[in-house]
Amino acid sequence: MSGHSKWATIKHAKGAADAKRGQLFTKLSREIIFAAKQGGPSPEGNARLRLAIQKAKDNRMPSDNIERAIKKGSGELEGATVIEIILEGYGPGGVAVLVNGMSDNRNRTVSDVRHMFSKSGGSLAESGAVSWIFETKGVIGVETVGLDTDELSLKAIDMGAEDVNIEEDYMEIYTAMPDMEKVRQQLEAQGVTVDSAEINMIPKNTVKLDEETSLQVLKLLDKLEELDDVQTVSSNADFDPEVVEKYHSQA
């Protein structure tokens, strides 16, 4: 899982690629709208909505915005129809890239994503081309400054986590998708501050890249995540930490 871990850590270190607060809230709102439309407006009976609301709260989205998004999803308020779009492609070096989007206009989203792939020397692929490389997991992020990481790792496994990854002052805890909420709640009950908790697509295997290709892929992932209609981006690239630092220094 190291390839995903390093990319997730990159996002943590530089802030989200969509650091513009307004754009971030738009993305969070779309996830809430879609979840409420699919499973109903009650968080108690809608796991996806619970996760979307929690993510919004983690990012300090005002409660009024959250409530308004729920009402749009349930039909209580008028709003554009939001659909989920999964796009697959190949980046520089043949890296597999999976793009999850929420949009009110599929044609616009596909066009924007295709343009970013083309600019990077990559290409969009047919459905199923790379999705088999990934599996859905819960990923919980914890800042580990002042914590005993060995002890925390053992606790997380005892709580039901499948794996952990530690890089510098950050730990990622991987769970089966249905177990993420439970593990998060147990961590917080023991005084652990959870930095993030998301459902992500994790590569089963990763590919090592040379420096030039790594920099190209990192730029592509950033540019994709900056698109208004894109929620998350996953790849099977394994980045060298020194190359990541170089990328940040050039950004």
Curated annotation (Swiss-Prot):
Q: Where is this protein chiefly located?
A: cytoplasm
Q: Where in the cell is it found?
A: Cytoplasm
On whether Transcription is a keyword of this UniProt record, the answer is yes
Q: Does the keyword Ion transport apply?
A: no
Against InterPro entries, the record matches this protein to: Integrase-like_N, TACO1_YebC-like_2nd/3rd_dom, TACO1_YebC_N, Transcrip_reg_TACO1-like, Transcrip_reg_TACO1-like_dom3, YebC-like
Which Gene3D superfamilies would you find in this protein's record? 1.10.10.200, 3.30.70.980
One CC-aspect GO term:
cytosol
Instruction: Report the Pfam families cross-referenced here.
Output: TACO1_YebC_N, Transcrip_reg
Q: Which family is it part of?
A: Belongs to the TACO1 family.
- Indicate what this protein is called per its UniProt record: Probable transcriptional regulatory protein DET0444
The organism of origin for this protein: Dehalococcoides mccartyi (strain ATCC BAA-2266 / KCTC 15142 / 195) (Dehalococcoides ethenogenes (strain 195))
